[in-house]
Amino acid sequence: MSASDLTSVQAAAPQGSRQILVTSALPYANGQIHIGHLVEYIQTDIWVRALRMHGHEVYYIGADDTHGTPIMLRAEKEGLTPKQLIDRVWTEHKRDFDSFGVSFDNFYSTDSDENRVLSEKIYLALQEAGLIAEREIEQAYDPVKEMFLPDRFIKGECPKCHAKDQYGDNCEVCGSTYLPTELLNPYSVVSGATPVRKTSKHYFFRLSDPRCESFLREWVSGLAQPEATNKMREWLGDAGEAKLADWDISRDAPYFGFEIPGAPGKYFYVWLDAPVGYYASFKNLCERNGIDFDAWIRPGSKAEQYHFIGKDILYFHTLFWPAMLEFSGHRTPTNVFAHGFLTVDGAKMSKSRGTFITAQSYIDTGLNPEWLRYYFAAKLNATMEDIDLNLDDFQARVNSDLVGKYVNIASRAAGFLIKRFDGRVQDSAMNHPLVAKLRDAIPQIAASYEAREYGRALRHTMELADEVNAYVDGAKPWDLAKDPANAVALHETCSVSLEAFRLLSLALKPVMPRVAAAVEAFFGIAPLAWADAAKPLSSAQPIKAYQHLMTRVDAKQIEALLAANRDSLQADAAGAAAGGANAAKDAKSNAKANAKPAVVNGADDAPISIDDFAKIDLRIAKIVACQAVEGSDKLLQLTLDVGEEKTRNVFSGIKSAYQPEQLVGKLTVMVANLAPRKMKFGLSEGMVLAASATDEKAEPGLYILEPHSGAKPGMRVK
């Protein structure tokens, strides 16, 4: 290697070691890790590994989010204490993260002494600052279970479209939002009883305080993602608008969580102590390893603090969390990085299609975790864009990039080097122009990782792999090996190929750490860091016998994975049926004991006559345009051709299942004679029909009805 080569590589390395604390959002301890979760943990882990390869002091912290009503109720249903449930789920989550190479320095639990102490300390500091308010509020109360009910634990009939079994805050059929008090025939999803209204004292974090607003307006300017900045400014509004609302941080007993100091029977809402769990997990690590915790979290700390999250929880991490930290005497996050959602084959993950894929089913089916790490990395960038796991593309990309391009290089050269040259490279070959080009590219690839542009880093890497393969194809070592007179040329070809392979492995190490470890063992070298681009292979260290590093993805493995997850749906359904029967018995006996009958779903679904059905005008409609509704998380605006002179405008609550571009040009079925309804987004002139499971938690998914292609807009369905 020339002196100039060495200088260029070293100049790209960061000057001085940084202290960096990194977190991913905490998984809720109420279910399994699935591939949608893994997008975030893999994204964070790649970033952390890339920074560690610079020699920085980096700590990647995680924990299970363990508090709240859902965990309390699930534990009761399973005959466990909440502690027993969260301990079991922690073991399952830790197993899954280990399987996918997620390299937490500490994976802990929010149900810890450290978290209790820190949550109380932050709360008391906010109280001292005059940022905690007490107010009486009215809530729904379950008289059978003797507990207050969150909105999502109340169901009933939508007051607008009269769809049954809708949640207490919004209708998933027509997209309306409303108060739980407006629901018709409401019932508790916990017991089936009719809720009553009760008042209770609650505690609020005064986010509307001018101090909070002023701080957040300044803090938002430092966010790395323009989408996040724009969203925060939308929430903040213009100066003087006072759009920020105070945040209810308390819940009433019974509740699984931490009791609020000086407020018996009142508990911290899970979203207060969950982010504090980042610090609690780090404090636990610090105490075990002699790290100065306070030096990392005090105001003005030189340490950096980053949070990777899904875009759905941006509100908590860019409003409440930084404000809580600022006014409780802590440093604030350096930045928050939000990612998009995962779809599978262009649609929301579905248990019925087998695409609601759990981490454990992926491992049990025998698929390589580093295949998925590579595929996700190839799709990820620094924006909040959603990413799609296309299973055909997954198979093709892994087989082409990783097997056909990358590991193929080593397999083509290693045998010749061991057999003909005792496994020792030709030192002069380390200055070959191709090797120099790869070496010069390493700083650019490392910079792409730090910028969270993983797709760019991998495209660059695979372009270089193409050049290496073209070099091997041109040199034809298999032909050179036939004539002893070509020994020098053969030695050079194999040496260049293997040094290039080492550099490609360095470039891929943040994404595929296990393959990188196998490559390090193959070459007999220390763990690779970015600075090692300048340390080529040497004839002083012979390589070891080549072992296969990766196999191809087989279509049968994909089929088995989908089948395994469809089977799990059937098992869940059987369990839900049994559980539902038991719950019905319990609700009946509880209701009897309280002299109040429980509501039974569907009891009023009396048969209708053919005349009743004839009143509904169902028409074929063509979706000629579709767009997301700004300000709504659920609605799409459809422009429909119904065979009339003018198109119709319809709002539909199917945003969770479809991207707008997926629907344009499709035929569907609409209720054409439904009275137009004025919504805050505009006038809705009908309703499109969509199917969903009765229990959408057990089987999520919405599916619009699509007639055969021979149908035409305006045709009547009868």
From Swiss-Prot:
<dbReference type="InterPro" id="IPR015413">
    <property type="entry name" value="Methionyl/Leucyl_tRNA_Synth"/>
</dbReference>
<feature type="binding site">
    <location>
        <position position="171"/>
    </location>
    <ligand>
        <name>Zn(2+)</name>
    </ligand>
</feature>
<keyword id="KW-0479">Metal-binding</keyword>
<comment type="similarity">
    <text>Belongs to the class-I aminoacyl-tRNA synthetase family. MetG type 1 subfamily.</text>
</comment>
<keyword id="KW-0862">Zinc</keyword>
<dbReference type="GO" id="GO:0004825">
    <property type="term" value="F:methionine-tRNA ligase activity"/>
</dbReference>
<keyword id="KW-0963">Cytoplasm</keyword>
<dbReference type="Pfam" id="PF01588">
    <property type="entry name" value="tRNA_bind"/>
</dbReference>
<feature type="domain" description="tRNA-binding">
    <location>
        <begin position="612"/>
        <end position="718"/>
    </location>
</feature>
<keyword id="KW-0694">RNA-binding</keyword>
<comment type="function">
    <text>Is required not only for elongation of protein synthesis but also for the initiation of all mRNA translation through initiator tRNA(fMet) aminoacylation.</text>
</comment>
<feature type="binding site">
    <location>
        <position position="161"/>
    </location>
    <ligand>
        <name>Zn(2+)</name>
    </ligand>
</feature>
<dbReference type="InterPro" id="IPR002547">
    <property type="entry name" value="tRNA-bd_dom"/>
</dbReference>
<dbReference type="GO" id="GO:0000049">
    <property type="term" value="F:tRNA binding"/>
</dbReference>
<dbReference type="InterPro" id="IPR014729">
    <property type="entry name" value="Rossmann-like_a/b/a_fold"/>
</dbReference>
<dbReference type="InterPro" id="IPR029038">
    <property type="entry name" value="MetRS_Zn"/>
</dbReference>
<dbReference type="InterPro" id="IPR014758">
    <property type="entry name" value="Met-tRNA_synth"/>
</dbReference>
<keyword id="KW-0547">Nucleotide-binding</keyword>
<dbReference type="InterPro" id="IPR004495">
    <property type="entry name" value="Met-tRNA-synth_bsu_C"/>
</dbReference>
<dbReference type="Pfam" id="PF09334">
    <property type="entry name" value="tRNA-synt_1g"/>
</dbReference>
<dbReference type="InterPro" id="IPR033911">
    <property type="entry name" value="MetRS_core"/>
</dbReference>
<dbReference type="GO" id="GO:0005829">
    <property type="term" value="C:cytosol"/>
</dbReference>
<dbReference type="InterPro" id="IPR009080">
    <property type="entry name" value="tRNAsynth_Ia_anticodon-bd"/>
</dbReference>
<feature type="short sequence motif" description="'HIGH' region">
    <location>
        <begin position="27"/>
        <end position="37"/>
    </location>
</feature>
<feature type="binding site">
    <location>
        <position position="174"/>
    </location>
    <ligand>
        <name>Zn(2+)</name>
    </ligand>
</feature>
<dbReference type="InterPro" id="IPR001412">
    <property type="entry name" value="aa-tRNA-synth_I_CS"/>
</dbReference>
<keyword id="KW-0648">Protein biosynthesis</keyword>
<feature type="binding site">
    <location>
        <position position="351"/>
    </location>
    <ligand>
        <name>ATP</name>
    </ligand>
</feature>
<feature type="binding site">
    <location>
        <position position="158"/>
    </location>
    <ligand>
        <name>Zn(2+)</name>
    </ligand>
</feature>
<dbReference type="InterPro" id="IPR023458">
    <property type="entry name" value="Met-tRNA_ligase_1"/>
</dbReference>
<dbReference type="GO" id="GO:0046872">
    <property type="term" value="F:metal ion binding"/>
</dbReference>
<keyword id="KW-0030">Aminoacyl-tRNA synthetase</keyword>
<feature type="short sequence motif" description="'KMSKS' region">
    <location>
        <begin position="348"/>
        <end position="352"/>
    </location>
</feature>
<comment type="subunit">
    <text>Homodimer.</text>
</comment>
<dbReference type="InterPro" id="IPR012340">
    <property type="entry name" value="NA-bd_OB-fold"/>
</dbReference>
<dbReference type="InterPro" id="IPR041872">
    <property type="entry name" value="Anticodon_Met"/>
</dbReference>
<keyword id="KW-0820">tRNA-binding</keyword>
<dbReference type="GO" id="GO:0005524">
    <property type="term" value="F:ATP binding"/>
</dbReference>
<keyword id="KW-0067">ATP-binding</keyword>
<dbReference type="GO" id="GO:0006431">
    <property type="term" value="P:methionyl-tRNA aminoacylation"/>
</dbReference>
<keyword id="KW-0436">Ligase</keyword>
<protein>
    <recommendedName>
        <fullName>Methionine--tRNA ligase</fullName>
        <ecNumber>6.1.1.10</ecNumber>
    </recommendedName>
</protein>
